[in-house]
Each structure stands twice: as C-alpha cells, then as structure tokens.
A protein has these predicted regions:
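Residue-level "edge-of-site" marker
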Residues: 26, 45, 106, 145-146
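Secondary-structure end/capping motifs
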Residues: 61-139
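Pocket-lining segment of extracytoplasmic ligand-binding domains
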Residues: 6-94
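Short secondary-structure boundary/hinge segments and terminal tails
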Residues: 31, 48-50, 110-111, 148-151
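Residue-level detector of family-conserved "landmark" positions at structurally sensitive sites
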Residues: 42, 103, 142-143
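Short beta-strand-to-loop elements that line the ligand-binding cleft
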Residues: 1-5
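C-terminal solvent-exposed extensions
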Residues: 134-152
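Residue-level signal for threonine
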Residues: 56, 118, 148-152
Length: 152
C-alpha cells in the first residue's frame, strides 16, 4: 500500500498510477460523480464509520458544560440536515466547494447524530490501531485509553 493524502491519492488514481483507492466521503462521492469510480468493497460489517470531535483534556476538564452545549448544537444541526438533505447539500457544497450532486450523494449515505465516546467505541478504535500497527501502517503501538475522554 501507498499512503497518500486525499488530493494526491485522487491525482494518482485519476492518472492510473494506482489501481485502487481507499477513501472516505466526500472524496468518495466526488470520485464517483466526477471520475466514474465504483466501489469494490466497503467496511460494512467490519468497522463502524465514525467521525470524532476533539478537545484538549485540559479544556474538557475545565469546561464540560461548553462541550455538552456544543454536542447539543451539533445534534440540532444533524437533525436539521437529516430532515433537509437537499438544503444541507446546498449549504455544504458552498462550504466545501463541491458540486451539489456530490454533497447530495455524500449526505444520502451519511449517518447523523453525535454521542459521547464509550468504552465499546474505544475498543473498536483500539482494534483498528492494533491492526494498523501489525500491518506496519503506523510506526508504534498505540494505547487509546490515553486519548479517552475525561471520566471514561
């Protein structure tokens, strides 16, 4: 495997310098719409597709109420986006500089909602980190408990 940033990987894929590309949305949706790329396999049943919001441990310890409010607001936006996908696609296309057809495809398969990290989620991520280390994709073994939220 060759590890490239999304823009470099797309260029390599587009030129035929790589035969396949592992990527996530909205880059996947863009490749599908603009390059005619097709999905050979996805991670359904292997790993969960999650996104994360981070803060420093110090900030989280000093301002838990701010983080609670942030999660509430993110969930409010997610609820709106889930019910208004066309409007959300238009908004997102302006922010990302992508055609609305791309953001519409991306949002059509997106999962909405934010929740605190749990021990189960951390265990999923630890298994992925361990596999990456075993495959020599990362240089050292990680202990994700070091990144666990305060109080977990």
């Amino acid at each position: 495997p060759v590890c490239l940033a999304p823009a470099a990987a797309r260029a390599a894929f587009e030129k035929g310098a790589v035969d396949a590309w592992i990527i996530w949305d909205p880059f996947l949706a863009s490749a599908q719409k603009m390059l005619g790329a097709r999905i050979l396999a996805d991670a359904t049943g292997v790993v969960n597709n999650r996104a994360y919001y981070f803060s420093s441990r110090d900030f989280a310890s000093r301002h838990p109420e701010v983080l609670r409010i942030a999660v509430e607001e993110i969930n409010a936006i997610d609820r709106w986006a889930a019910k208004n996908k066309d409007a959300a696609a238009t908004e997102l296309s302006a922010v990302l500089g992508l055609d609305t057809a791309i953001t519409r495809l991306y949002l059509g398969r997106a999962q909405f909602g934010t929740a605190p990290v749990t021990r189960e989620i951390l265990a999923e991520q630890q298994a992925i980190a361990d596999a990456f280390f075993d495959l020599k994709l990362i240089p050292k073994k990680l202990n994700l408990l070091h990144a666990a939220p305060v109080g977990l």
